[in-house]
Amino acid sequence: MLYNLSKAVLALSVLAASADAAGIRLEKRASTFDYETEMVRGVCLGGWLVLEPWLSPGLFDAAPDGAVDEWTYTEILGQDEAKARLIGHWDTFITEQDFFDIAAAGMNHVRIPIGYWAVEALPGDPYVDGQLEYLDRAIEWAGAAGLKVIVDLHGAPGSQNGFDNSGRKGAIQWGQGDTLGQTVNAFRKLAERYVPSSDVVTAIEAVNEPFIPGGVNEDQLKEYYQQAYDIVTQMSPDVDLVFSDGFINPTPWNGFISDSGNIVMDNHHYEVFDINLLRMSVDDHVRSVCDFGRTQLAPATKPVVVGEWTGAMTDCARYLNGRGVGARYDGAMGGESVGDCGPFIQGSVSDLSPDDQKNMRRFIEAQLDAWEMKSGWLFWNWKTEQGAPGWDMKDLLDNGVFPFPLESRKYPGQCG
């Protein structure tokens, strides 16, 4: 198919580019990306340098049941054993070839999550380090492939959302004690490493998914964002701060900090984590995302990138809701059952019925059209270890469910 042909053509340049990349060491900044005028089209490299059980279930299946996030994984296994296993994961889950495949698909960005503990773990933390060397390498590979990088502080001290993807599942304790100052310190060190020196890193994200509806104090969050903005703008006029809307949507942030440059809002849009959304038909999903583009993205006074979204319309992917936790869709979490999870749990999108594949393609196309009403998008995620239909962009591209070229449409004009 066209995507695989494009990969093959681009692969001819990999050896030469690899040789060039080997000599790159984050030198003086030269180029930028204009988030005000250019369209972001990219993908996240989740589950690599910050663990998530559903993206790399094999790591967790080989660990005791109490390992449900990176904190407990390293705590239970011990640092020596955990680091040995994680090095094996870091070496293989994402490689240089992935960056060339992403570029071959027509994308211009990757967003790379990293935890605060990779920069500087706190006393008493069980985490292991070593991730920054891989992030350095990833930035070199991205540059060789012609991609821009958003460095994403995905986990903050105390957990900013209580999700396993923050490093520690459970209560939100970000904002308590010294956690805000500790986050500023981690962010500053991350910025010092990449903002002044890499022409590949065009933006850095203050913190991933601070959960305002879950209890994060909005005033404290705004104070932190201001400090992060000052750190970045003092280091370089060519790098933007990315900040999450905190799950309160983009338009309430109009006028915050600056509407005139060096700042980008990150909105995450999923329609799978609520039973009412799971009940919706594909027509409903299409209308929903198109309406969101018109009412929340287009009127925003800053650039807004939908920095996480999916082709899935169920929450059936194994461990998506947490290790050992079932899905809402089939009633395993309690309450009504919308349908059978079946082939949506694990494996390839090619295992789905033709109708399910068509509906997923239609939903993906509608989202692409909606998100490009503003500043673009970053799909979650590039790959999964054991397959998660609808979430694995590489699998979606390989099976023609994600458009290639990105502008191609089987269902044009869905957003009017």
Curated annotation (Swiss-Prot):
It is found in: Secreted. The active site is at E209, E308. Its cofactor is Mn(2+). GO terms for biological process: cell wall organization; glucan catabolic process. Its main location: secreted. This is Probable glucan 1,3-beta-glucosidase A. It catalyses: Successive hydrolysis of beta-D-glucose units from the non-reducing ends of (1->3)-beta-D-glucans, releasing alpha-glucose. Gene3D superfamilies: Glycosidases. Keywords: Carbohydrate metabolism, Cell wall biogenesis/degradation, Disulfide bond, Glycosidase, Hydrolase, Manganese, Metal-binding, Polysaccharide degradation, Secreted, Signal.
